């Protein structure tokens, strides 16, 4: 896997976790630290981005994941290079058991262990958002 980019869905649960850890919002540097601690980044992820040389490729994948969350209404911009959870975002975090009903955050070790499972679920969300016309209902019934 070291020759492939980490799919952006792998960043989704850690982004929500970073925002929860920050009390509902976090700056990009805090999110970066959280991602590096949780996501097993490949050698390719650390390569320089061809379009933005000062950034690693994983920064672009992370930015796309955050933008997807903004489009979904899960995350909102909360200032310059800062994001916050919306009510919907908090509900998604609860649904994925990133936070308990009592407000206890998921343990980072458990998050690392369940990362693939979370990524698969977030992939389902993306298919709905990025391909809304993929399923055309039959009208001839």
Stretches with model-predicted labels:
Residues 4-6, 36-63:
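Short, positively charged loop/turn segments that connect secondary-structure elements
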Residues 28-32, 36:
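An amphipathic alpha-helix signature
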Residues 70-80:
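A short, conserved structural fragment
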């Amino acid at each position: 896997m070291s020759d492939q980019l980490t799919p952006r869905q792998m960043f989704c649960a850690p982004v929500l976790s970073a925002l929860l850890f920050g009390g509902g919002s976090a700056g990009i540097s805090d999110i970066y630290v959280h991602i590096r601690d949780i996501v097993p980044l490949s050698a390719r992820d650390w390569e320089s981005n061809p379009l933005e040389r000062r950034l690693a490729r994983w920064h672009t994948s992370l930015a796309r994941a955050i933008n997807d969350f903004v489009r979904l209404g899960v995350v909102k911009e909360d200032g310059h290079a800062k994001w916050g959870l919306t009510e919907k975002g908090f509900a998604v975090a609860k649904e994925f058991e990133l936070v308990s009903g009592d407000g206890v955050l998921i343990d980072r070790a458990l998050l690392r262990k369940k990362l693939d499972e979370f990524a698969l679920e977030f992939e389902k969300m993306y298919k709905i958002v990025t391909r809304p016309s993929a399923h055309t209902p039959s009208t001839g019934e």
